[in-house]
C-alpha cells in the first residue's frame, strides 16, 4: 500500500472511530493554499496549528516559516499525534497531545510570548459550545495585535461565533477540497 493510501485509510478509520475527526479524508493542497498561501511568514516567531491531523498542512507551513520560527502543533487524537511525532523531525516543531484550550499555558511555560498565526482545522461544528468559546477566547488572548487566526470549516454555522470573538472576519471558499470548505481569516 502506498503512503497516500495508508494516510487515506488511517484518516478514514479515525473518522469512523472518533467524533472529533471532522472529515473522512485529509485536506487538499488547494485548501492549504486558501489558508496560508498569501501569508508572509518571514517575520513570524511563533506559529500554531490546532488539529493538524496527519499533517496535511504542516509540511507546507514548515517550508514557509523562517529558520528561527517555532511551529506548535496541538493534536488530541492519539493516532494522529503518534504519526506526527514519527514523521516530523524538525527542531522548530513542538508536537503536543493536548487540547487547543491549553495554548496559553504552553506559551507561558515555554516563555514564548504571543503568536503570529494560528491555523485551525478543528471541526468546530462537532465541539460543544463552551469548549468552542474557550478555544476562541484562548486564541484571541494569545495572538499578537497583528496576528491572524485562520480556521476552515465545511459550513457557515460558526460564522457569527467567530465574529463575536474577532474584530474582523474575512471569508473565502474553495470547491477544490472534499468536502468543499470555507476559510475564515480572523483578526483581533
Outline where the language-model segments fall:
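Glycine-rich SAM-binding Motif I of class I
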Residues: 55-59
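Conserved SAM-binding motif I beta-strand of class I
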Residues: 70-75
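Conserved beta-strand signature within the Rossmann-like core of class I S-adenosyl-L-methionine
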Residues: 143-153
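Conserved class I S-adenosyl-L-methionine
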Residues: 43-53
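S-adenosyl-L-methionine
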Residues: 80-110
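Core SAM-dependent methyltransferase catalytic element
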Residues: 174-188
Amino acid at each position: 500500500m502506498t503512503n497516500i493510501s495508508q494516510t487515506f485509510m488511517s484518516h478514514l478509520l479515525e473518522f469512523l472511530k472518533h467524533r472529533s475527526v471532522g472529515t473522512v479524508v485529509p485536506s487538499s493542497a488547494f485548501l492549504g493554499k486558501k489558508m496560508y498561501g498569501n501569508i508572509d511568514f518571514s517575520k513570524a516567531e511563533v506559529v500554531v496549528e490546532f488539529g493538524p491531523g496527519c499533517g496535511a498542512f504542516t509540511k507546507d507551513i514548515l517550508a514557509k516559516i523562517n529558520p528561527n520560527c517555532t511551529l506548535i502543533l496541538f493534536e488530541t487524537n492519539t493516532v494522529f499525534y503518534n504519526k506526527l511525532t514519527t514523521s516530523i523531525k524538525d527542531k522548530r516543531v513542538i508536537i503536543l497531545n493536548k487540547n487547543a484550550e491549553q495554548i496559553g499555558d504552553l506559551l507561558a511555560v515555554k516563555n514564548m510570548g504571543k503568536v503570529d498565526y494560528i491555523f485551525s482545522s478543528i471541526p468546530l461544528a462537532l465541539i460543544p459550545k463552551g469548549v468552542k468559546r474557550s478555544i476562541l477566547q484562548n486564541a484571541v488572548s494569545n495572538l499578537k495585535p497583528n496576528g491572524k487566526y485562520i480556521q476552515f470549516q465545511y459550513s457557515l454555522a460558526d460564522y457569527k461565533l467567530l465574529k463575536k470573538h474577532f474584530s474582523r472576519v474575512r471569508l473565502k471558499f474553495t470547491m477544490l477540497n472534499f468536502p468543499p470548505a470555507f476559510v475564515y481569516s480572523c483578526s483581533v
